[in-house]
């Protein structure tokens, strides 16, 4: 071989690497094929859109959890945040007859507060993330149970004084969870948009790369001049924000503010 010419060997195929990267997608495809062969109604447009609609809310929460995992943490409070924003957004319309501004801003503000408190406990006080967010899970659960008095919130519900709730779920809000655009459910469209934006943000922006570097090696990232506390705080705030948005979308979908709606969201989001 001539001097200065190096032989470049192609990378050998690794079954383990292939399964690691594409195993989940392959399993989903296989399951869909099996159900399609056994049930002719499975692979239909209506059924697929129903499946996508059902996982849209979990996807919102899962994206939030992903941000905390990327920086090497774990947010256990997302389920309680879902329940909090579900009952608060419902109460804004049913109890207080508020419009678009309060119905959207108040739940979002509360979810941001939850994220900031989580970040304060984990980043500033340096409480282990599992302990801090577990404590917030119970605190937020207690808050929304006290606020709703343990009752789900719905139109024409009886109040403590014997009267009926004055408000109802507004059409614009229900459209977010039940409406369609060009035969596609609005929650599905919102989910695809959110997934696309999140992918671009994490893969192609400076902040996204900084988040990965922070989670990959915290000390090395700090010595490299990366403001790791800022990015860890950002991750917990985004985790709570997306959980809050998922809770609002859930209320819009079912037309009720269920107090226990977020109970199973954490494990579903982690599995997703």
Where are each of the predicted segments found?
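Hydrophobic alpha-helical segments embedded in the membrane of multi-pass proteins
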Residues: 55-64, 80, 84, 116, ...
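Membrane-helix/interface signature in polytopic inner-membrane proteins
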Residues: 196-237
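Transmembrane helix-bundle core of multi-pass membrane transporters
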Residues: 129-204, 231-234, 254-262
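Alpha-helical transmembrane segments within multi-pass membrane transporters and channels
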Residues: 97-137
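Inter-helical junctions in multi-pass inner-membrane proteins, predominant
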Residues: 40-50, 144-151, 180-181, 201-208, ...
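Hydrophobic core segments of alpha-helical transmembrane domains in multi-pass membrane transport
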Residues: 24-37, 64-65, 137-144, 188-200, ...
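Transmembrane alpha-helical segments of polytopic membrane transport and secretion proteins
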Residues: 1-23, 43
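Single transmembrane alpha-helix segments in multi-pass membrane proteins
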Residues: 30-96, 121-126, 252
């Amino acid at each position: 071989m001539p001097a200065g010419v190096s032989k470049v060997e192609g990378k050998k195929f690794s079954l383990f690497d292939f399964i690691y990267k594409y195993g989940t997608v392959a399993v989903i495809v296989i399951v869909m094929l099996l159900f399609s062969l056994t049930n002719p109604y499975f692979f239909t447009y209506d059924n697929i859109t129903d499946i996508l609609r059902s996982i849209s809310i979990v996807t919102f929460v899962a994206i939030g959890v992903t941000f905390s995992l990327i920086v090497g943490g774990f947010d256990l409070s997302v389920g309680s945040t879902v329940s909090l924003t579900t009952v608060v957004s419902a109460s804004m319309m049913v109890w207080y007859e508020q419009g678009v501004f309060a119905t959207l801003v108040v739940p979002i503000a509360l979810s941001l507060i939850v994220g900031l408190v989580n970040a304060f406990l984990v980043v500033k006080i340096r409480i282990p993330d599992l302990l801090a967010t577990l404590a917030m899970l119970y605190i937020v659960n207690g808050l929304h149970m006290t606020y709703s008095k343990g009752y789900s919130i719905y139109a024409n519900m009886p109040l403590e004084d014997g009267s009926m709730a004055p408000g109802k779920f507004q059409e614009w809000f229900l459209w977010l969870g039940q409406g369609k655009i060009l035969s596609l459910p609005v929650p599905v469209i919102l989910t695809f948009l959110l997934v696309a934006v999140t992918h671009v943000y994490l893969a192609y922006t400076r902040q996204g790369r900084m988040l990965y570097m922070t989670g990959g090696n915290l000390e090395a990232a700090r010595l490299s001049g990366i403001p790791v506390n800022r990015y860890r705080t950002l991750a917990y705030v985004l985790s709570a924000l997306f959980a809050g948005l998922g809770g609002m979308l859930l209320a819009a979908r079912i037309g009720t503010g269920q107090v226990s709606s977020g109970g199973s969201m954490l494990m579903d989001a982690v599995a997703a």
